[in-house]
Amino acid sequence: MSVGVWAVIPAAGRGVRFGSPVPKQYLPVVGRPLIVYTLEALAAHPAVCGLMVVVAEGDLAWSGWTELAGKPLLTCSGGVTRAASVLSGLLALPQVVHADDFVLVHDAARPNVALSDLERLLEAGCAHPVGAILAVPVRDTLKRAGSDGSIDGTEPRERLWRAFTPQLFRRSQLVRGLQVAAADGIEMTDEAMVMERQGLRPLLVECAESNFKITTPDDLVRFEFELARRV
């Protein structure tokens, strides 16, 4: 595709669920910080023309990179929530990124997105009136639990998907939706939710299961295995 996009990568989280004293995006993987793999995966696509990494205020672990694969790599300070950090990143984008331009938002701890999946997201999302997200259909059987921990019932899974990233939307629509949600005190857990709240219906683009997020130590082991397979 010929349309150039910037990517916003919220990386201000502390990784509390991971249980490490080091934020998980900076954990060493084969001698390099995890976030480097994420940034390289995005920068590898020719349509990605710049990266905005949103770091925590006073982040001492960030190495101060300003360029990756010949593309500008900028930083700004994030907020206390993921949504606040995404909003900060969107507002800090350079002037070359216009209000109606599409922007990618991608988790810092999701380092294994395939170039082919990114290509399909950009092709489908930029042709869609709203935008699109990478996602995976739910394939497991889902059970609804009662308050006592027993099974209350089985949920139909035919139309359920697991939302992944990157997610691709127009900058102005995301900014507006995030600002309104913040004013209303509503937590937005992903960008698609922001669009849904505006009455918009983003497109689902199926991607590989290997585009998983590093949330637990087991996930990190899995990513190391994926890296070994590349050799």
From Swiss-Prot:
Its EC number is 2.7.7.60. Signal peptide: none annotated. The keyword Ion transport does not apply. It is an enzyme of class 2 (transferase). It catalyses: 2-C-methyl-D-erythritol 4-phosphate + CTP + H(+) = 4-CDP-2-C-methyl-D-erythritol + diphosphate. Pathway: Isoprenoid biosynthesis; isopentenyl diphosphate biosynthesis via DXP pathway; isopentenyl diphosphate from 1-deoxy-D-xylulose 5-phosphate: step 2/6. Keywords: Isoprene biosynthesis, Nucleotidyltransferase, Transferase. The keyword Transferase applies. Disulfide bonds: none annotated. The record marks 17, 24 as: Transition state stabilizer. PROSITE patterns: ISPD (PS01295). SUPFAM superfamilies: Nucleotide-diphospho-sugar transferases. The record marks 157, 213 as: Positions MEP for the nucleophilic attack. GO terms for biological process: isopentenyl diphosphate biosynthetic process, methylerythritol 4-phosphate pathway. Belongs to the IspD/TarI cytidylyltransferase family. IspD subfamily. Catalyzes the formation of 4-diphosphocytidyl-2-C-methyl-D-erythritol from CTP and 2-C-methyl-D-erythritol 4-phosphate (MEP). This is 2-C-methyl-D-erythritol 4-phosphate cytidylyltransferase. It comes from Xylella fastidiosa (strain Temecula1 / ATCC 700964). The lineage of its organism: Bacteria, Pseudomonadati, Pseudomonadota, Gammaproteobacteria, Lysobacterales.
